[in-house]
Structures are given as structure tokens and as C-alpha cells.
């Protein structure tokens, strides 16, 4: 539910162009959102203050949602005997958080900036790291398959981050598709491990605990970067 709410907030920042892919598919052109009405007197309204108010509201909303998810993850890890089921839930949460904030940053275009893209990629990598941990503790071909998914997902996030930071005003839709793909792979892998490994061992539990610590640390780091986004918005000349 919270992830869906994040996506609603992401809608506030829609501003991207179509981007072709290898399979010939392209992403449609979403229309650029109009800033919300300002309650100040019209004589004091400026483009800068309106934009900063809009972005600040969106960032605060997303930040609150992410922090709520982080608290849930921390509490869950403290429960004895969580096993693979809780580990899969935490892994999926990491994917949702990372892709959600990554989309918000990318689709915000130049208004959000490279710092937001970096924050989203950082958090997405926390989820990918947990997927990789599953691969380390699983036997044979299953473990190798899981690690292959993690490696590929990591490369996709890096590519989306690099493209987004380099040409923010042009590739919001490209980054959006990349992050969504990673999100689905994280969830699929976590669910597969959850159903395949149906017993609790000390090694699995240890992996979950270590992964959860990494996840929550990544969330805290991302929250700090989100707070900096608004502070680093530079006033732009208001054109007639």
C-alpha cells in the first residue's frame, strides 16, 4: 500500500520523454505536470518559490513513507525465527523502496537533480544486495541463478543511474522502466527463495540479519540525501 502511495507522489514529478529500447518498444510521452496553485498573493508568486514548495511537499511525503517502511523492516528482523519468509519480505521491501524513490527522482527531471537519482540507486542496490545473499547460501544451480539475477539487476540500476544523472531532462522514462524491471526481479527472486527453501538454519538467519542491517543503513543514508535535495535547488531566472 505504501509503495502505491509512493507511486502516486511520483506522479507529481512526471516530466520525461519517450526513449527507445532494443526490442523496439518505446515509452509514451507523459505530459509535464503543472505546479500547484500558490496561496500567496499573485504579486509575490515566483516560479522558484512555487517549484520549491511543490518539490518540498513531495520529498517530505516520500521520506515519511520510506521511514515507515524502514521501521517495519527493523522490527521484523528482531523477531526470533523469522526464517526465509521474513527475509523475502525484507528483500521485496528494499526493491520497492529503491525503485520508488528512483522513479521519483528520475521523473522529476532537472527539478530534482542528480542527487535524487543517486539516492534511489543507492537504495535499490540494498535490495539487490539481499538478493545476492540468497545466492550465497543456496546450493548449486539455484544459488548461481539467483546471483545471476542480482548481477544483472545491479547493472541495470547502474545504467539507469548514470543515464539519469547525465541527461535528466531526456531520459526520465528510460530510468523509470529500468527501475521497474529491477523491482520485479527482486520480488520474483525473493518469492522463489521463500517457497523453495522451507526450513530455517543458522546460516540463513545470519544472512537475513546481516542483510537487514545493510538495508536499514542504506535507508538512513538515502533519507539524508533526500533532505539535501530541496536545500540544493538553485533559483532559476524567471522568464517573461
Curated annotation (Swiss-Prot):
Expressed by the venom gland (anterior main gland) (at protein level). Residues 39-50 have a biased composition (Polar residues). Residues 25-50 are annotated as: Disordered. Residues 1-18 form the signal peptide. It is found in: Secreted. GO terms for cellular component: extracellular region. The keyword Signal applies. Keywords: Secreted, Signal. This is Venom hemolysin-like protein 1. It comes from Platymeris rhadamanthus.
Amino acid at each position: 500500500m505504501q509503495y502505491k502511495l509512493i507511486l502516486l507522489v511520483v506522479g507529481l514529478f512526471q516530466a520525461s520523454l519517450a526513449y527507445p529500447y532494443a526490442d523496439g518498444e518505446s515509452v509514451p510521452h507523459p505530459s509535464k505536470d503543472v505546479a500547484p496553485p500558490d496561496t500567496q498573493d499573485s504579486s509575490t508568486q515566483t516560479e522558484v518559490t512555487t517549484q520549491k514548495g511543490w518539490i518540498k511537499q513531495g520529498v517530505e511525503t516520500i521520506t515519511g513513507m520510506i521511514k515507515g517502511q524502514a521501521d517495519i523492516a527493523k522490527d521484523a528482523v528482531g523477531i526470533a525465527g523469522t526464517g526465509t519468509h521474513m527475509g523475502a519480505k525484507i528483500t521485496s521491501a528494499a526493491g520497492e523502496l529503491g525503485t520508488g524513490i528512483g522513479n521519483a527522482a528520475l521523473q522529476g527531471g532537472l527539478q530534482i537533480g542528480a542527487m535524487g537519482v543517486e539516492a534511489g540507486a543507492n537504495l535499490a542496490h540494498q535490495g539487490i544486495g539481499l538478493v545476492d545473499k540468497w545466492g550465497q547460501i543456496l546450493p548449486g544451480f539455484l544459488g548461481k541463478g539467483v546471483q545471476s539475477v542480482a548481477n544483472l539487476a545491479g547493472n541495470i540500476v547502474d545504467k539507469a543511474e548514470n543515464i539519469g544523472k547525465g541527461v535528466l531532462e531526456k531520459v526520465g522514462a528510460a530510468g523509470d522502466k529500468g527501475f521497474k524491471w529491477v523491482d520485479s526481479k527482486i520480488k520474483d527472486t525473493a518469492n522463489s527463495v521463500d517457497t523453495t527453501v522451507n526450513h530455517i538454519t543458522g546460516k540463513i538467519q545470519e544472512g537475513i540479519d546481516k542483510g537487514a542491517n545493510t538495508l536499514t543503513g542504506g535507508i538512513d543514508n538515502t533519507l539524508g540525501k533526500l533532505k539535501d535535495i530541496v536545500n540544493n535547488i538553485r533559483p532559476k531566472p524567471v522568464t517573461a
